[in-house]
Swiss-Prot record:
The gene is sip5. It comes from the Eukaryota. InterPro entries: Sip5/DA2. Residues 244-255, 796-812 have a biased composition (Polar residues). The keyword Cytoplasm applies. May negatively regulate the snf1 kinase. This is Protein sip5. Its main location: cytoplasm. Residues 1-97, 159-187, 200-232, 244-266, 317-340, 384-412, 507-533, 554-718, 732-777, 791-812 are annotated as: Disordered.
């Protein structure tokens, strides 16, 4: 039965809900709790709610997820709609205020000179304007002429097109108000009575107020004035006492001043109020608009400034102090500065835009009449309640005397009661500074923790060490030092970490235990001690970081220096190789030229020798250019030495002196391009090249047909070469014993070292043919070639001659 009743009971509920939702979505959109959303979105969300109650769990969960996603997506849209609504409300409130409220012909809302955000306190600004301590927001004129008539001034002040001087538009026509009679003055006196809500009304006041209640209310009346003027005036004694004793809100509302409207009087001294205000218009030096002469005056330099420009001037955002100066003239921030010693953000007071003096403030001298809104508790209005200023009365009977027009000679203090500073219209600057300091402290703490964690995590050698992470620096340093001793090449095993570990262990061993005992004994340690320890930790960490950076920079500088040294060594080596190669090319150019100038029939043996000599100039050449001599067998080497011996024996009878004289200058000229260190590598190819060069030089001198045996001692008397031939040396050694000896001779060409030392590899490659008769002749040929081609510069060479070679020479 219960289930059937439930089944019968649910459909009407759901249908009624559905109908109500449909009606609400189509007709009354504002009655829904989701009225701030878009029409389609609100109807869709309202239509989905009955389904959630009817369907099962599965469908509701899916729709719930979709609804949550939808709410996340429309959060920014709701914020934008909220801001749009606030802006529309401000526009409507501005229109209403400009239509119904004014202070002495000025307004309580801005006139749109600046389109930025109005971040000043509007309630404080409104109160100061109603108290006549700050100039109202006058309507600014783009142009002004002193010759304008009254209706032209009225049109300009109301924002209408300026008519011709002799033409008065119908909307600007006015009639002088008639003089008020005695009956007409009584309602004004009754209206200007100060409503006293803290005590009961007297019988006379109640009778007078109840007799003419309609005439006591001015028109138009603001909502605030109507709400505060009707109920307190007609409230009985019992209600007053009850409100004082039971309502806390009532006591707070009674303590605030009440706004009342003065009687409507559009004339001042028989003139329209617009014409009276703007007949002596003055220009604001900041926005360059023309305003009534009743403007704010700066306290320091007595310059005029309109209220709309004044409320735009504010303190700069909180920032670190410049030039090491502390925040001046900020007594309210002394406590904050003491509490935030580590976050030294300051908020300097605004400076005067004219004389750049700090603590910018203004003073205001109101016009000599009162119109519009006033505070009921304003003591300056009490003497005039019985004699209100009429349009026909003189200015002398006004409440405040007009200004004398004389400029103030001295500046006023920022603490003067008549001075309104920029901090007065923005009283939240201290809270903003505190919030900025707190935010900076949080960011600093987060950055410090992040840097500390990054440093400690990077100092571990592996990921396993990160699990042992703790806030104790000494323990972390000890663990990292133990784990990183094997890996000396890692970054954390550098001297920087050792220095940092040493720096962290500067404290005494009992410091940590003392701090731990203090922490257990005092659960809430003093704030100063914790801040001091935190500052010490920060200083210690900064010192550690500075040492680490210094060591890292020194290591980087050392690596750069080593790299530069390696580059310089490589560059010098390349230059040496290039110079050596160039020296070889220049040294053998004349020899190749002399060999190419031979006019003799080509022979196979001669061609082989020539190709071998040409390959010496570039030792890195391809194997097809004559390097196959290195890879020949000892038999082939012996055959080549035999051929060179036969060629040398045919030319033994030639006198070498003319050839030596001819090649002297060429050797001297080629020596000018060589350096003593440019020596080719010792190779046995040098022997064949030298033999071919000596043969080519000997063939050139065969045209003189000199005959006779070669005298080895004759070479020692040459003026250009200071040496003895190898044959003479061998001849001299025959007279001695059969042991081997070293003969120190001086050669005049750097390449002689290679040619002399190249005999040793030949002897090593031909061990079986060292006793053949062809070997001494080849050695003598090489020596002759060396003697003929050596330049002046000499180097000491040692030639080792065995006894077998000397015996073979003796037999020849």
């Amino acid at each position: 039965m219960g289930n059937s009743q439930t089944k019968e009971f649910r459909p009407p509920l759901s249908s009624s809900n559905r109908r109500s939702h449909q009606w609400g979505s189509s007709s009354s959109h504002g009655r829904s709790p989701y009225s701030d959303r878009h029409h389609a979105e609100s109807s869709r969300s309202r239509g989905s709610r009955p389904d959630l109650s009817i369907l099962g769990i599965g469908g509701s969960s899916e729709r719930d997820v979709a609804t949550l996603e939808h709410r996340r997506e429309t959060k920014q849209e709701r914020e934008a709609r909220r801001l749009e609504k606030e802006r529309a409300a401000r526009v409507k409130e501005r229109e209403r205020s400009m239509r119904e409220e004014h202070v002495d012909g000025g307004y309580l809302v801005t006139q749109g000179v600046y389109v930025g955000t109005e971040d000043f306190n509007k309630a404080v600004t409104r109160q100061l304007m109603i108290e006549r301590r700050l100039a109202p927001f006058w309507r600014g004129l783009n142009d002004f002429s002193e010759s304008w008539t009254e209706h032209q001034l009225m049109a300009a002040a109301r924002g209408l097109p300026i008519p011709p001087p002799d033409e008065i538009p119908p909307e600007l026509e006015y009639k002088n108000p008639p003089k008020l009679s005695g009956d007409g003055k009584e309602p004004s006196i009754q209206h200007l009575m100060v409503p006293i809500t803290s005590r009961s009304q007297s019988y006379g006041s109640e009778a007078s107020q109840s007799s003419t209640p309609a005439h006591s209310l001015p028109a138009p009346v603001s909502p605030i004035a109507s709400g505060t003027s009707t109920s307190p005036l007609f409230r009985s004694r019992a209600k007053t006492l009850a409100s004082l004793t039971t309502s806390k809100l009532g006591s707070q509302s009674d303590s605030t001043p009440k706004e009342i409207h003065l009687p409507e009087d559009p004339f001042v001294n028989g003139q329209p109020i617009e014409a009276y205000l703007y007949k002596d218009a003055t220009e604001c030096p900041i926005c360059f608009l023309y305003y009534p002469p009743y403007l704010n005056r700066t306290r320091c330099c007595d310059q005029p400034i309109c209220s709309e420009c004044f409320v735009q001037i504010k303190r700069p955002d909180p920032h670190p102090p410049e030039h090491g100066e502390a925040e001046p003239n900020a007594a309210a921030a002394e406590g904050d500065r003491q509490d935030n010693q580590d976050c030294q953000l300051v908020s300097e007071p605004a400076a005067c835009p004219f004389c750049v003096q700090p603590e910018f403030g203004v003073t205001y001298t109101p016009p000599p009449f009162r119109r519009g809104l006033v505070y009921a508790t304003d003591p300056t209005l009490r003497p005039n309640f019985t004699s209100p200023v009429s349009s026909t009365s003189s200015l002398a009977s006004a409440n405040a005397s007009p200004g004398t027009g004389r400029r103030r000679a001295t500046s006023l203090s920022a603490n003067d009661p008549a001075v309104i500073t920029t901090d007065r219209v923005r009283p939240d600057w201290a809270q903003k500074l505190a919030n900025a300091r707190a935010h900076a402290a949080r960011r600093s703490a987060a950055a410090t923790a992040l840097h500390t964690a990054a440093y400690l995590m990077n100092s571990t050698a592996s990921g396993n060490e990160s699990r042992n992470f703790s806030l104790g620096r000494r323990g972390v340093m000890r663990r990292t030092g133990q784990s990183e001793t094997p890996s000396a090449s890692s970054r954390s095993g550098s001297p920087a970490l050792q220095a940092l570990a040493f720096l962290t262990d500067r404290r005494t061993p009992g410091h940590d235990t003392d701090s731990a005992e203090e922490g257990t004994g005092n659960l809430a340690p003093p704030r100063n001690s914790s801040r001091r320890s935190r500052i010490d930790d920060l200083e210690e960490m900064m010192m550690m970081e500075a040492i680490r950076l210094s060591l890292a920079s020194e290591e980087e500088r050392r690596k750069k220096a080593e790299k530069e040294a390696r580059k310089e060594a490589k560059r010098r080596e390349k230059e040496n190789k290039k110079a050596e190669k160039a020296a070889r090319k220049h040294g053998f150019y004349s020899n190749n030229a002399s060999s190419s100038a031979l006019d003799v029939p080509s022979d196979a043996r001669l061609g082989r020798v020539a190709s071998t000599s040409s390959s010496i100039t570039g030792e890195d050449a391809s194997p097809s250019k004559g390097k196959e001599v290195d890879r020949t067998s000892p038999a082939a080497t012996a055959a080549s030495s035999q051929s060179s011996t036969e060629i040398a024996s045919e030319s033994m009878t030639i006198n070498p002196h003319p050839n030596v004289v001819e090649q002297g200058p060429s050797a001297q000229s080629s020596m000018a391009q060589l350096s003593p260190r440019e020596l080719p590598k010792p190779s046995h190819l040098r022997q064949v090249s030298s033999a071919s060069s000596s043969f080519s030089s000997l063939v050139e001198s065969t045209g003189e047909d000199h005959s006779g045996a070669y005298d080895g001692n004759a070479s020692s008397t040459e003026p250009l070469f200071n040496f003895r031939s190898l044959a003479a040396v061998i001849g001299d050694e025959d007279k001695g014993d059969g042991t081997a000896e070293h003969v120190e001779d001086t050669s005049s060409k750097p390449s002689a070292e290679g040619s002399a030392s190249s005999t040793a590899p030949v002897a090593d490659e031909m061990p079986g043919q060292s006793t053949t008769p062809a070997d001494p002749i080849a050695v003598k040929t090489v020596a002759e070639d060396r003697d003929c081609l050596m330049p002046k510069e000499l180097e000491t060479q040692s030639v080792e001659i065995t006894s077998a070679t000397r015996n073979a020479e003796a037999t020849t």
